[in-house]
Design a protein with these regions (language model features):
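Short, surface-exposed helix-loop/turn micro-motifs enriched in polar/charged residues
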Residues: 20, 24-27, 171, 198, ...
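Flexible mid-to-C-terminal extensions adjoining Fe-S/redox cofactors in radical SAM and related proteins
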Residues: 215-231
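Radical SAM enzyme [4Fe-4S]-AdoMet core and its adjacent flexible, acidic
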Residues: 63-75, 82-195, 201, 205, ...
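Active-site flanking residues adjacent to catalytic metal/cofactor-binding acidic residues
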Residues: 54, 211-212
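Canonical radical SAM enzyme core domain
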Residues: 1-50, 54-60, 67-79, 83, ...
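Glycine-centered loop/turn positions within well-structured domains
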Residues: 59, 91, 227
Length: 231
């Protein structure tokens, strides 16, 4: 919810405090519904990689991707993607695999590749627990979660298409990281890494966790307002 002025100030702080030779990469995640030329110009100027949440064609995307008023968001998301493309901004499709699209893996992949022109794709399984008290606990999951067999079938459909024609042309995080591990090259996904905890999750209040999948009281490392991260 922060505006452009906030992010311009962040870029000034990065330039001021970056160590000599240090390389800093900028990424941001958005639903793209409010992106305009000003945002796109800013992202292009600072070489941001923009992750855009989109779950397939309209009939699949809009099952769960609706705004607070209950209106579908698909058309606004696609408009935002086109704005990014018009300004040459690198973008990444962040596609959740859920109960609505789990049986349509190939359709989703072809839509992202052929209609949106996505060259970077992440498939993210929706596995969420009810949180009546604010903290998700227990083993029950919500109705929109992908089923284990559905997730496997989804990835298998996509892989069969990808391995035949898109290796080296379309980056699918799950597949490329798996191939990297096979070749003894460190991958970017924590689930394929030897150890966990290389991607810290910092909450707005200063709470620090070793992974954004475990932002729960049992996994709290500390708070940076009380304890420096180096400790």
């Amino acid at each position: 919810l922060m505006g452009l002025d906030f992010y311009r100030q962040v870029m000034e702080l990065v330039a001021r405090h970056r160590r000599p030779g240090q390389v800093i990469e900028h990424t941001i995640q958005t639903n793209a519904t409010l992106l305009d030329s000003a945002w796109a110009q800013f992202f292009a100027e600072h070489d941001f990689l923009v992750g855009v949440s989109i779950d397939g064609p309209a009939r699949l995307h809009d099952v769960y991707r609706r705004d607070k008023g209950g209106k579908p968001s698909f058309d606004r998301v696609v408009r935002g993607v086109r704005v990014l493309q018009d300004h040459g901004v690198r973008w990444n499709a962040l596609t959740t695999v859920n109960r609505a699209n789990e049986e349509h893996g190939l359709e989703v992949y072809r839509f992202l590749r052929d209609e949106l022109g996505a060259e970077y794709i992440q498939f993210i399984p929706v596995v969420e627990r009810p949180a009546p008290g604010g903290i998700p606990v227990g083993v029950e999951v919500t109705d929109r979660c992908v089923r284990p067999g559905g997730y496997g079938a989804f990835l298998s459909e996509v892989f069969d298409e990808w391995v035949r024609r898109d290796v080296g042309r379309v980056y699918v995080q799950m597949f490329d990281t798996t191939l990297a591990n096979y070749l003894n090259v460190p991958g970017s996904m924590c689930v394929h890494a030897q150890t966990c905890g290389t991607a810290l999750a910092l909450e707005h209040n200063g709470d620090l966790y070793s992974c954004d999948h475990f932002v729960e009281p049992d996994y709290l490392l500390g708070n940076i307002t009380e304890t420096p991260m180096l400790q």
